[in-house]
UniProtKB/Swiss-Prot annotation:
<protein>
    <recommendedName>
        <fullName>Large ribosomal subunit protein uL11</fullName>
    </recommendedName>
</protein>
<comment type="function">
    <text>Forms part of the ribosomal stalk which helps the ribosome interact with GTP-bound translation factors.</text>
</comment>
<dbReference type="Pfam" id="PF00298">
    <property type="entry name" value="Ribosomal_L11"/>
</dbReference>
<keyword id="KW-0687">Ribonucleoprotein</keyword>
<dbReference type="InterPro" id="IPR000911">
    <property type="entry name" value="Ribosomal_uL11"/>
</dbReference>
<dbReference type="GO" id="GO:0070180">
    <property type="term" value="F:large ribosomal subunit rRNA binding"/>
</dbReference>
<dbReference type="InterPro" id="IPR020784">
    <property type="entry name" value="Ribosomal_uL11_N"/>
</dbReference>
<comment type="subunit">
    <text>Part of the ribosomal stalk of the 50S ribosomal subunit. Interacts with L10 and the large rRNA to form the base of the stalk. L10 forms an elongated spine to which L12 dimers bind in a sequential fashion forming a multimeric L10(L12)X complex.</text>
</comment>
<dbReference type="GO" id="GO:0003735">
    <property type="term" value="F:structural constituent of ribosome"/>
</dbReference>
<keyword id="KW-0689">Ribosomal protein</keyword>
<dbReference type="InterPro" id="IPR020785">
    <property type="entry name" value="Ribosomal_uL11_CS"/>
</dbReference>
<dbReference type="Pfam" id="PF03946">
    <property type="entry name" value="Ribosomal_L11_N"/>
</dbReference>
<dbReference type="InterPro" id="IPR036796">
    <property type="entry name" value="Ribosomal_uL11_N_sf"/>
</dbReference>
<keyword id="KW-0694">RNA-binding</keyword>
<dbReference type="InterPro" id="IPR020783">
    <property type="entry name" value="Ribosomal_uL11_C"/>
</dbReference>
<dbReference type="GO" id="GO:0006412">
    <property type="term" value="P:translation"/>
</dbReference>
<keyword id="KW-0699">rRNA-binding</keyword>
Length: 141
């Protein structure tokens, strides 16, 4: 890949194992000239062990219309909703609380998300998770 020139970076959030050519994937990749079905098959094969998780993916498109992609960990808000079995956060976060997150859950989420965060210390990652939880209307014990 030393001579290939990067022409576009595409960032999407796609449920694991459920990529299909429908919007938003099709139009984003079609505009870059990428083989849409080729991407969908590769992505679904790579993420079949994480069905239903909303996965951020960064697709790098090269000048010869080939591509590579990197999947990341699900967003913190998705991990919190999954841990508490919630559909969504509170509409009014400072008034209506929709759940409680224990320190053990905060630590587990922070450890899972650490490699995608720009932090070195686990305590910093935990504070980021706690802040996201508070903005969703979730109390942190």
């Amino acid at each position: 890949m030393s001579n290939k020139k990067v022409i576009k970076l595409i960032k999407l959030q796609i449920p694991g194992g459920k990529a299909n050519p429908a919007p938003p994937i099709g139009p984003a990749l079609g505009a870059a000239g990428v083989n849409i079905m080729g991407f969908c098959k590769e992505f679904n094969a790579a993420t079949q062990d994480r069905p239903g998780d909303l996965l951020p993916v960064v697709i790098t498109v090269y000048s010869d219309k080939t591509f590579t992609f990197i999947t990341k960990q699900p967003p913190v808000s998705s991990l919190i909703k999954k841990a508490l079995n919630l559909e969504s956060g509170s509409k009014i976060p400072n008034r209506n609380k929709v759940g409680k997150l224990t320190q053990a859950q905060v630590t587990a989420i922070a450890e899972q998300k650490m490699k995608d965060m720009d932090v070195v210390l686990l305590d910093s990652a935990k504070r980021m998770v706690e802040g996201t939880a508070r903005s969703m209307g979730i109390d942190v014990e």
